[in-house]
């Protein structure tokens, strides 16, 4: 049976934390930024934690993690 492969898209988007949670970056911060307020852009900086309902789905895409 062949090896299970990690989805490249998931590998680039998600990071696993030591406590089992999954970290992701916010979207909407690449272009068309002039119409967004400074507050909107500031709140999109940094990372967010994926909801517990989606963690199982992300783990299925990354079997080696």
From Swiss-Prot:
The keyword Ribosomal protein applies. Keywords: Ribonucleoprotein, Ribosomal protein. Signal peptide: none annotated. GO terms for biological process: translation. InterPro entries: Ribosomal_bL35, Ribosomal_bL35-like, Ribosomal_bL35_CS, Ribosomal_bL35_sf. One of its GO terms (cellular component) is cytosolic large ribosomal subunit. One of its GO terms (molecular function) is structural constituent of ribosome. Pfam families: Ribosomal_L35p (PF01632). Belongs to the bacterial ribosomal protein bL35 family. HAMAP family: Ribosomal_bL35 (MF_00514). This is Large ribosomal subunit protein bL35.
